[in-house]
From Swiss-Prot:
<dbReference type="InterPro" id="IPR020781">
    <property type="entry name" value="ATPase_OSCP/d_CS"/>
</dbReference>
<comment type="function">
    <text>F(1)F(0) ATP synthase produces ATP from ADP in the presence of a proton or sodium gradient. F-type ATPases consist of two structural domains, F(1) containing the extramembraneous catalytic core and F(0) containing the membrane proton channel, linked together by a central stalk and a peripheral stalk. During catalysis, ATP synthesis in the catalytic domain of F(1) is coupled via a rotary mechanism of the central stalk subunits to proton translocation.</text>
</comment>
<keyword id="KW-0139">CF(1)</keyword>
<dbReference type="Pfam" id="PF00213">
    <property type="entry name" value="OSCP"/>
</dbReference>
<protein>
    <recommendedName>
        <fullName>ATP synthase subunit delta</fullName>
    </recommendedName>
</protein>
<keyword id="KW-0406">Ion transport</keyword>
<keyword id="KW-0066">ATP synthesis</keyword>
<dbReference type="GO" id="GO:0005886">
    <property type="term" value="C:plasma membrane"/>
</dbReference>
<keyword id="KW-0997">Cell inner membrane</keyword>
<keyword id="KW-0375">Hydrogen ion transport</keyword>
<dbReference type="InterPro" id="IPR000711">
    <property type="entry name" value="ATPase_OSCP/dsu"/>
</dbReference>
<comment type="subunit">
    <text>F-type ATPases have 2 components, F(1) - the catalytic core - and F(0) - the membrane proton channel. F(1) has five subunits: alpha(3), beta(3), gamma(1), delta(1), epsilon(1). CF(0) has four main subunits: a(1), b(1), b'(1) and c(10-14). The alpha and beta chains form an alternating ring which encloses part of the gamma chain. F(1) is attached to F(0) by a central stalk formed by the gamma and epsilon chains, while a peripheral stalk is formed by the delta, b and b' chains.</text>
</comment>
<keyword id="KW-0813">Transport</keyword>
<keyword id="KW-0472">Membrane</keyword>
<dbReference type="GO" id="GO:0045259">
    <property type="term" value="C:proton-transporting ATP synthase complex"/>
</dbReference>
<dbReference type="InterPro" id="IPR026015">
    <property type="entry name" value="ATP_synth_OSCP/delta_N_sf"/>
</dbReference>
<comment type="function">
    <text>This protein is part of the stalk that links CF(0) to CF(1). It either transmits conformational changes from CF(0) to CF(1) or is implicated in proton conduction.</text>
</comment>
Length: 186
């Protein structure tokens, strides 16, 4: 299945595919997705957890004990907790954000949805997210799952990647275009 989806490749793709197949067999695809989304939110909210996940400085034992404590305190159990512990034991926890993204793509494909990566300067309101989903659904004819990333560097606007298509309506890109046009004119 990983070979059929270009966004699901490499080490993270193999782990995501294995997790997806296990979750599908256990009929827990949505529960695992919800857990992974919660873990991703925890990473976004905690620089310490992000450092623990990404830094090769921590020993496998330290990383394993710390992650077990975090998962226990956050109430993670079952397939997702076991999977995150396997990633840790295999020294692949640093790939977890890519695994979460790839797992989301597999779930979307399984449900017949399209997945769009959206980059914004500030978090979008639920109203704006719904409007964006509706607009993308009218283009694709499918329900669209959004992977929203906040990047203040784009200044404003948004960048949408859907399959092989990309629409960049960020303020940064527009300002760069004006800058280049002025250089050519001057």
């Amino acid at each position: 299945m990983a070979a059929e989806n270009p966004s699901v490749s490499g080490v993270s793709g193999r782990y995501a595919t294995a997790l997806f197949e296990l979750a599908r067999d256990e009929k827990a695809v949505d529960a695992v997705k919800a857990d992974l989304d919660r873990f991703k939110a925890m990473l976004a909210d905690s620089p310490e957890l992000t450092r623990l996940v990404r830094s090769p400085v921590f020993s496998a034992e330290t990383q394993s004990k710390a992650l077990a404590a975090v998962l226990d305190k956050a109430g993670f159990a079952g397939t997702t907790a076991k999977f995150l512990k396997v990633l840790t034991a295999n020294r692949r926890l640093f790939t977890v954000t890519d695994v979460i993204r790839a797992y989301g793509a597999l779930v979307a494909k399984f449900k017949g949805e399209a997945t769009a990566d959206v980059t914004v300067a500030e978090p979008l309101s639920e109203k704006n997210l719904d409007a964006l989903k509706t607009a993308l659904k009218s283009v694709t004819g499918k329900d669209v799952a959004l992977n929203v990333n906040v990047d203040p560097a784009i200044i404003g606007g948004l960048v949408v990647k859907l399959g092989s298509r990309m629409v960049d309506s960020s303020l940064r890109t527009k300002l760069n275009s004006i800058k280049h046009a002025m250089k050519e004119a001057g």
